[in-house]
């Protein structure tokens, strides 16, 4: 089965930290089949596991910043819990927008700049 973007990020992180799937699964207390399922998308990715995986790699000196977003895409689900009405409307608007991929890319870059600058 092909890897999801989440799976690609996790696999790259394992390679970058010289960690095998088996080593990671043992340290996290799960089977390698479970982790493989998260990488391939055959299993939904619980928020708890995103945090656990981020912490796992952080302890090895590697920060994974977009992992929750990649998990949301892999799960085909974005929670609106805790978002304001205007944020929820914005998410819904983007989900059904007629914007081109180039326009969406430009908006994503703008949002990234806003978030990184704290403006």
Q: What is each PLM-predicted segment?
A:
Residues 11, 22, 51:
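Residues within the helices of the helix-turn-helix
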């Amino acid at each position: 089965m092909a890897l999801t973007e989440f799976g690609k990020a996790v696999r790259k992180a394992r390679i970058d930290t010289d960690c095998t799937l088996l080593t990671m699964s043992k340290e996290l207390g799960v089977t390698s089949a479970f982790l493989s399922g998260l990488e391939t998308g055959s299993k939904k990715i619980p928020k708890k596991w995103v945090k656990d995986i981020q912490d796992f790699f952080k302890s090895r000196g590697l920060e994974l910043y977009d992992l929750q977003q990649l998990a949301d895409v892999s799960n085909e689900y974005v929670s609106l819990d805790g978002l304001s009405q205007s944020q929820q409307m914005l998410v819904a608007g983007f989900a059904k927008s007629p914007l081109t991929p180039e326009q969406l890319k430009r908006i994503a870059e703008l949002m990234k700049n806003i978030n990184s600058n704290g403006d």
